[in-house]
Amino acid sequence: MALRLTAKQAAGPLEITKTTGERTMSQIRYLLQLAALAAMLGYALPSSAETIIDEWQNIKAPPPPQLQAVTLDPKTTALIMTDIIKQTCNNEMRPRCVTSIPKIEKLLTAARASGVTVIYTLFPSRSPATFPNPVISDYIPAVAPKGDEPVVTSFADKFMLGDKDTGLQKILKDKGITTVVPVGVVAHNGILFTAVEAAFRGFNVIVPVDGMAGNGPSGYDEQATAHILTDSIVYKVTLTSLDMIKFQ
């Protein structure tokens, strides 16, 4: 705080005038008083002790990502049919999966006709005594495998089973695949983790949003998956829909 002394003041008590610094302090005090008043009226900012769970109902969903039409080269594209079996794709657990079957079947038919590599996945049971290990015959008939189409078994990340390679990477590389299209269940497990891992491994990843199903009818799992897949600077995933995919 600056002091201004006149000749008169030099001979007597000092008179201190308000400077810029003093005015700033007054403004700060005024703002603090306003904040205290706002708190009393219930308009205070959220407490630092609040968590994302406390704020759950007040969080607004981000804008929806844009879907893109894609034309894929059959020679370098693989369609990964992910766990579309009766145990996981039914009206009780995942009604969206059931309603997506006709469109997935249409895409599968077009893929086979164009010579696209089709790969199937299963998952091992964590409790075989109460939930037997799924087998390939559990696939929904409309989208079941044909001939010698390969099958890999894993949990969410279809490239790895624990610390072991599932063979998916080798299948893709041996066939010259550069683009993968995972469809099926579950959106926030098998689709999400396989898509991200494929992107990390250098593959182009195309995910049809109406070809993945989460738990229940709400659509929250699918929305969250779509947001995560497209909101990263580390990996790139293209979102599309089943009828926006062409092979040429």
Task: Give the positions of each predicted feature.
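Cleavable N-terminal signal peptides
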Residues: 36-37, 47
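Active-site-adjacent betaalpha module
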Residues: 49-78, 106-109, 131-248
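Von Willebrand factor
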Residues: 108-127
